[in-house]
């Protein structure tokens, strides 16, 4: 019985799942919007939001915790120098999930996950890329 077990398995073992979400979290912090399947986007929210909350108080200990979760110094720097101050007045809800149809190959539901206070220039950049 799987009583009280939270989180989705996504047909992966635990190390693969951890590596996948670490990479996806880094991509989301770097680009501030990514396109993925809807279940992955919903699960990624549970990884990224605590990282941004951690980045709101800049300390060596918090930077080390963020590095332990992302393993990327560039991402840690962006979290604490840009995203932490940007979301300082917001009490959670840093990401937005937008459904965007179904994937052609397997009809999987797709979604964009983005940071809510993204700048307009990045929105135009994504629109021109597609």
Curated annotation (Swiss-Prot):
Pfam families: Ribosomal_L17 (PF01196). Part of the 50S ribosomal subunit. Contacts protein L32. It comes from the Bacteria. One of its GO terms (cellular component) is cytosolic large ribosomal subunit. NCBIfam families: L17. GO terms for molecular function: structural constituent of ribosome. HAMAP family: Ribosomal_bL17. Keywords: Ribonucleoprotein, Ribosomal protein. Belongs to the bacterial ribosomal protein bL17 family. This is Large ribosomal subunit protein bL17. InterPro entries: Ribosomal_bL17 (IPR000456), Ribosomal_bL17_CS (IPR047859), Ribosomal_bL17_sf (IPR036373). One of its GO terms (biological process) is translation. Disulfide bonds: none annotated. The gene is rplQ.
